Amino acid sequence: MRLDERTAVVTGATRGVGRGVGRELAAHGARVFVTGRSTPEPDAGDARTIYVRCDHRDDKDVEAAFGQILHDAQRIDILVNNVWGGYERMLEDGVFTWANPFWEQPLWRWDAMFAAGVRAHYHASQLAVPSMIARKRGLVVNISFWAAQKHIGNVAYGVSKAATDKLTADMASELKPHGITVVSLYPGLVRTEKVMEAAEYLDLSNSESPEFIGRAVVALASDPEVQRHTGKVLVAADVAREYGFSDIDGTTPRPLTLADV
């Protein structure tokens, strides 16, 4: 599965899932632009990855970043909307308030989940898809989660993820005539930096590396018939079974279901 001559953009990719996605795309030959507010530590030998500083809550910042990318690369073939601000400030004055009932939640938390979430995905897609339309092909992957379908601790969280899946469905409808595929992709329990800090409290027996999500994106981007998936919600572990890849440690995580989350 080679992606030579393809240009990919992964938003919010200086760490966690986004960084794993960027690594896998680059490893399979794509030229990868990763955006984020913090400067990532460089990966050894990762000459195909270009960091573009961008605060996705700032429209001018986003427009400048995509302007730079399109100036340098002249095209965007793959867009992975991964940026997410919903986990910031989960503690207030040392107290975990993220899972409080909605009537006790500050409105800034709702705003954070949408501004650095579905709104950021919408804006990035607006800027990226004209390049795809011009070539009548492209892939947009919106990273989402089961909270779109089931309450998982925070009302605003669920609404923002449901909005992401609706964004996927409606963008897919408008972009299908142009040969562009849009999907939502659900990871499982991912061994991100933050998760590993709490590893002693978690059951990681069915967890996934950040690169596993990247392998799912690579598989979709490599499939000439990928448009059969457009508008769908896909689970990374199900994608692994369909396309026959495993995680970086050789394991194949079991796909989660609503009953598991």
Language-model segments: which ranges?
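Conserved glycine-rich Rossmann-like NAD(P)H-binding loop of the short-chain dehydrogenase/reductase
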Residues: 28-43
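Conserved glycine-rich cofactor-binding loop
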Residues: 7, 14-15
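C-terminal helical subdomain
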Residues: 184, 202-261
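Active-site Tyr-X3-Lys motif and surrounding loop/helix of classical short-chain dehydrogenase/reductase
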Residues: 64-71, 90-91, 96-104, 108-115
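Rossmann-fold cofactor-recognition segment
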Residues: 46-60
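A short, exposed helix-loop element centered on a Lys and neighboring polar residues
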Residues: 125-126, 169
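Catalytic loop of short-chain dehydrogenase/reductase
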Residues: 85-86, 99-109, 139-163, 168-177, ...
